[in-house]
Amino acid sequence: MAEPSAPESKHKSSLNSSPWSGLMALGNSRHGHHGPGTQSASSAAAPKPGPPAGLSGGLSQPAGWQSLLSFTILFLAWLAGFSSRLFAVIRFESIIHEFDPWFNYRSTHHLASHGFYEFLNWFDERAWYPLGRIVGGTVYPGLMITAGLIHWILNTLNITVHIRDVCVFLAPTFSGLTSISTFLLTRELWNQGAGLLAACFIAIVPGYISRSVAGSFDNEGIAIFALQFTYYLWVKSVKTGSVFWTMCCCLSYFYMVSAWGGYVFIINLIPLHVFVLLLMQRYSKRVYIAYSTFYIVGLILSMQIPFVGFQPIRTSEHMAAAGVFALLQAYAFLQYLRDRLTKQEFQTLFFLGVSLAAGAVFLSVIYLTYTGYIAPWSGRFYSLWDTGYAKIHIPIIASVSEHQPTTWVSFFFDLHILVCTFPAGLWFCIKNINDERVFVALYAISAVYFAGVMVRLMLTLTPVVCMLSAIAFSNVFEHYLGDDMKRENPPVEDSSDEDDKRNPGNLYDKAGKVRKHVTEQEKPEEGLGPNIKSIVTMLMLMLLMMFAVHCTWVTSNAYSSPSVVLASYNHDGTRNILDDFREAYFWLRQNTDEHARVMSWWDYGYQIAGMANRTTLVDNNTWNNSHIALVGKAMSSNETAAYKIMRSLDVDYVLVIFGGVIGYSGDDINKFLWMVRIAEGEHPKDIREGDYFTQQGEFRVDKAGSPTLLNCLMYKMSYYRFGEMQLDFRTPPGFDRTRNAEIGNKDIKFKHLEEAFTSEHWLVRIYKVKAPDNRETLGHKPRVTNIVPKQKYLSKKTTKRKRGYVKNKLVFKKGKKTSKKTV
């Protein structure tokens, strides 16, 4: 099959000749349409003096000004993105946010303090007691290595910076690199102007800022840069067929694998791109060289990450890439045979080869899956195809808020006007299709599906939405701002008609030709009126202004609040800081034994280990479902049953989060049903979810609530002494502001626990587990008497009406005294 040339459509040519491509789209210096080398035939004959040397000479050329302006716009986009992510640092302080970043910070601190080798072999004894955790083989180390390397470089240059500050500002710094990689990718797909718009969009869009604010030291902060840069290098590889660009793509993919588990998206999207190109009969040597090199080298590099290991050749998530690689080799071999066999021989060999290959692949996959060599889809990936699978079979996956389906409001909240313009950009790419635009179309369609299934994957949709929206805005500006420039600067070409061009020998009578009258159909298209252009341009600029305002507002109010520090605002605008979390963790650090074991729900494990430096039973790694279910069973059981579990796990303290006083909705009572469901999955005989609902199927904490709920350990620890508290005169004592109900069990007493600490706003409550008594008290039966059987003994001290009797009491008789007279 002939190799298709890169399609340059008529539409693309018009884009490259517009002034929007030069300034507001700045895109055509790389195509050479307006470069200094384009000269007419007459001007080329006469030599012209060369341009002046130096900086002024470079800037006198159009390409020089375009490069300077492009650099300035990218720098301003980086600066705007970095600045908009600093709200949390300005309002609060330089602090690590959320839950997972605390483990990442703790690991990075260990790496910076003890070195890379010690980090790889680190056994964390403060996690998952009594099991522990081997950290080096269970994490993606790219984030820690990046922060540690930056910290080492700064200290080598005698710039003293604490590792915490490096971790806090790492994600805002990488947001600028993400803008640059998005610019490069969009420029390859369309033109430079669309790339600049895409860089500005992704710098401030809330969908990306949500995971890259200052303090959000998580894998996604650097992974989106690696994702976009890998895609850029892949598109470059497909366009050029160069092994150099493919090797660069493999190195970027290796960094992506080391940084985030979302690398699976890359290793499935790139094979899908190659497969669709084969279906569209767009096979070429460029595609063969790019994918063959990428798959082999990328496979070997990805297996160097300890946490990944042999997964690329033994898990179902990676089998599509292997299948496309085999298909591509077979396709290339058939192309080779097609040039060397007759048509009849090729058809016979083709059908025979396809049948044998399909049967061999089918049987091999069945055999390897049946024998267990190829692992099935993991629960988290399987839930992407069956959205109800996790809630039924693996409730711990469904309990994470990031794994819930995305609402329609979230799309507008995180993307704003880009949601509306993104389909237009996709249509432009499909209308003027080529190899790289097939890739971005597949990227967009797959990202939309995954973002609709899981809230967390909105992060992978945001970059492609910014790219395609930039293409849409770029086309609008080209059409409405470039119309006058096209008419003022018509292309330099001969005015003769096509017949004159075909027959240059007849040009001697050209001057005597009579021009035909131009009909209505032959008249050149008139430009748009100034009113229409002004209205459309102002409308587009207003939309962009509204987008910028929305992004700033969302970043400031929704995504710049650290979860470990809460804030509330009074009617006069003053702010109240609720620092209960750090207060409680600091109390644990200062007032408990260094080796004390703290039991809490898994959400707070990383924070307890990071801030309190105490041993936890479970944490956010969630690798051992049975261990988490055991903690959930203890929280869901009554005090006596829970005490046995806590004693078996050597628990010293129990920590719960309670938001009934301040109205905090993320407390443990609202998470309690997930504890019950996870515990029921492992202990169905002891824990049943239906026991915690009323007969009407309601989950209530008031008097109408289930007796099982009102007497479980979580309920008692949350509401202990709360029934005595009256928050205001309008509500009764024990009124829960979060659930808007008066609690049903106010007389709560503990036998095996005692309150150790309650934070200022009752947000964090810590209980100490009592040691077992040396001698257990025995329950005595009531004493009985011989007079009245089975009657309780009553002493004189308790009543004056009834006398007690002494058993076997001696009876004395009064004797007679003898008189003297008788004697």
Swiss-Prot record:
Q: Give the keywords, sorted.
A: Acetylation, Endoplasmic reticulum, Glycoprotein, Glycosyltransferase, Magnesium, Manganese, Membrane, Metal-binding, Phosphoprotein, Transferase, Transmembrane, Transmembrane helix
Q: Which residues hold dolichyl diphosphooligosaccharide?
A: 456, 606
Q: Where does Mn(2+) bind?
A: 100, 218, 220
Q: What is known of its domains?
A: Despite low primary sequence conservation between eukaryotic catalytic subunits and bacterial and archaeal single subunit OSTs (ssOST), structural comparison revealed several common motifs at spatially equivalent positions, like the DXD motif 1 on the external loop 1 and the DXD motif 2 on the external loop 2 involved in binding of the metal ion cofactor and the carboxamide group of the acceptor asparagine, the conserved Glu residue of the TIXE/SVSE motif on the external loop 5 involved in catalysis, as well as the WWDYG and the DK/MI motifs in the globular domain that define the binding pocket for the +2 Ser/Thr of the acceptor sequon.
Function (record text): Catalytic subunit of the oligosaccharyl transferase (OST) complex that catalyzes the initial transfer of a defined glycan (Glc(3)Man(9)GlcNAc(2) in eukaryotes) from the lipid carrier dolichol-pyrophosphate to an asparagine residue within an Asn-X-Ser/Thr consensus motif in nascent polypeptide chains, the first step in protein N-glycosylation. N-glycosylation occurs cotranslationally and the complex associates with the Sec61 complex at the channel-forming translocon complex that mediates protein translocation across the endoplasmic reticulum (ER).
Region annotation Disordered: where it falls in the sequence: 1-58, 487-526
Sorted alphabetically, the Gene Ontology cellular component annotations on this record are:
endoplasmic reticulum membrane; oligosaccharyltransferase complex; protein-containing complex
Q: Where is this motif: DXD motif 1?
A: 98-100
Q: Describe, as the record does, how this protein assembles with itself and its partners.
A: Component of the oligosaccharyltransferase (OST) complex. There are 2 OST complexes, OST-A and OST-B, which contain STT3A or STT3B as catalytic subunit, respectively. OST-A and OST-B contain common core subunits RPN1, RPN2, OST48, OST4, DAD1 and TMEM258, and OST-B contains either MAGT1 or TUSC3 as specific accessory subunit.
Site feature Interacts with target acceptor peptide in protein substrate: at which residues? Answer: 100, 402, 671
Query: Gene encoding it?
Result: Stt3b
Query: To which protein family does this belong?
Result: Belongs to the STT3 family.
The record ties this protein, via InterPro entries, to:
Oligo_trans_STT3, STT3-PglB_core, STT3_N
Glycosites = 613, 620, 624, 638
Q: Where is this motif: WWDYG motif?
A: 601-605
Phosphoserine PTM positions: 13, 18, 29, 495-496
Pathway stated in the Swiss-Prot or TrEMBL entry: Protein modification; protein glycosylation
List the source organism.
Answer: Mus musculus (Mouse)
Q: Which residues carry this modification: N-acetylalanine?
A: 2
Protein name, entry field: Dolichyl-diphosphooligosaccharide--protein glycosyltransferase subunit STT3B
Q: Coordinates of motif DXD motif 2 in the sequence?
A: 218-220
Membrane topology reported for the UniProt record = Multi-pass membrane protein
